[in-house]
């Protein structure tokens, strides 16, 4: 059972 990641992961630029 996979849980959708929300909010989506944010990568620092």
Swiss-Prot record:
UniProt-listed InterPro entries: Tryptophillin (IPR013266)
One Pfam short name: Tryp_FSAP
GO CC, one annotated term: extracellular region
Localization per record: Secreted
Tissue and organ distribution: Expressed by the skin glands.
GO biological process per UniProt: defense response
Residues found modified as Pyrrolidone carboxylic acid: 1
Entry keyword set: Amphibian defense peptide, Pyrrolidone carboxylic acid, Secreted
Record family assignment: Belongs to the frog skin active peptide (FSAP) family. Tryptophillin subfamily.
Name of protein: Tryptophyllin-13
Annotated source species: Pithecopus rohdei (Rohde's leaf frog)
Source lineage: Eukaryota, Metazoa, Chordata, Craniata, Vertebrata
């Amino acid at each position: 059972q996979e849980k959708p990641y929300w909010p989506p992961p944010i990568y620092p630029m």
